[in-house]
Amino acid sequence: MAHILGIDLGTTNSCMAVIEGGQPVVIPNAEGFRTTPSVVAFTKTGERLVGHAAKRQAITNPERTIISIKRDMGTNKRIKIDDKEYSPEEISAMILMKLKADAEAYLGEKITQAVITVPAYFTDSQRQATKNAGRIAGLEVLRIINEPTAAALAYGLDKEGHQKIMVYDLGGGTFDVSILEIGDGVIEVLATSGNNRLGGDDFDQRIIDYIADEFMKEHGIDLRQDKVALQRLKDAAERAKIELSSALQTTINLPFITADANGPKHIDMVLTRAKFEELIKDLVEKTREPVETALSDAKLTPEQIDKVILVGGSTRIPYVQEFVKKLTGKEPFKGINPDECVAIGAAIQAGVLAGQVKDILLLDVTPLSLGIETLGGVFTKIIERNTTIPTRKSQIFTTAVDGQTQVEIHVLQGERPLAKDNKTLGRFILDGIPPAPRGVPQIEVTFDIDANGIVHVSAKDLGTGREQKITITSQTHLSEEEIQRAIKEAEMYAEQDRKRKELIEARNRADSIIYQTEKLLRELGDKMTETEKQQIESKLKALKDVMNGEDKEQIERAIDELTKSFYDVSTRLYQQGYTASGPQGGPNPGGGQSGPDGNVNTDYKVY
């Protein structure tokens, strides 16, 4: 059975896992790391980089490096690179394509299906955008599940007995808290709350502002106005934050950060953990209200919670751990990896869908109330927040004026009493209502939320049976035409990436045979005939001339010609008793071993 990939598509880092032998296994990326930076970059030559490669070059290429795109999912934002604009879905798809390709290389099979996690507090449009990103990346997204729920799956897979747990999930860009009940293979979400604009990125920004403000006081230069300097500050801030989780102070050293008429300027300062905690105190405090709301909605007190589980890289910060301990009165559980448990949970859900994991039932909830605008601009809720999904609910409405023949259904998501203060999910018209006094027509509005948390709405005139229905798509949602275009471009990029990789591999082989040939000439050149030496030197030069070009076939032809001459000569020398560390005992050109047919079986790495 083909694997279904479980993906934690994070703000700062992403992770993937599958079920192997009935157990979830985290898949390392091509570079060997278990998490992949959610970073995309475009070089000035048009090459696309994703993950560690993109993050490494961010300092020298800040304007063409895209970070934290998850925060813009479900919005109208577009990222312009050269003459092309990219939607957040397309950038996220590039990250997903990298994960998909690395998983395929690791598993040795094609991946076509996935379960992707999202913050519990993601709106409908953000969930739709995530599903579209998967589609653009060539993945059928079987299920969208909430990150805290996935973490609970990872925690509760082998647990016996009944427990009420709180998942406190503070990641790079979002905060979620969920209250769940686990027992007898059932994982039921009782309540969820959160903040989609709060996370480790905000902590980094506080450090950046502190460093920049101190530098401004001393030198009168605002480093935030210099994009390269700002990117160096971002890197330094992230490193400092991580180091302060285990150290009481850290040194921030950035030589030649800028220059003025008096010469170059440097940063060399100490940031203590106490100062860092002072900088982020109010941000951490913002997590209090969602925690209290979730407890209230679940009708529980902190004392009734059996375990508090920390999820997300930002929960490694000691101040956050202490805050959670004081807030809940419990020592947080640290027995699961906060960076990997969400992907593991996604893989478990994938295993449930594939029938590989038995006896687990997941009951999730909708994070925000759903309803419509009614007379006077009032928001009338049809489905309350924290309702278990999938669900379907209906309510009867009527007309507001005499003779009204059509009604506009304005679909909203939120908790505020007035429609204007909530998020619009969509609008549609039900027409063809027979003229009648107001209050007479009976219009049934039905909300249907599927297991992905995606909303479907219908309105039906009970008098005529006339009905209109839509699957909600926000104004920022990509059209089908745009999705198809993005899919084609993604396939084109995948083809370009494949060709680029093949070109790099050809250059690597060329570099290896050049090294071995030059070594042979140094060690045994005096044992060759003049004709042999000239022939090898000629073909060596020909390969050097083309190896940095863009024509892979030309490079491979030059490699083949040089390899043939190399082996003709080295075989003759070997038979005469001369040795060199290519033909006898040592590695062959390309780092492999000679096969029985005399061809070279290469084994190399591409960096």
UniProtKB/Swiss-Prot annotation:
The modification Phosphothreonine is found at T174. Keywords: ATP-binding, Chaperone, Nucleotide-binding, Phosphoprotein, Stress response. Residues 583-595 have a biased composition (Gly residues). Residues 577-607 are annotated as: Disordered. SUPFAM superfamilies: Actin-like ATPase domain, Heat shock protein 70kD (HSP70), C-terminal subdomain, Heat shock protein 70kD (HSP70), peptide-binding domain. Belongs to the heat shock protein 70 family. Acts as a chaperone. This is Chaperone protein DnaK.
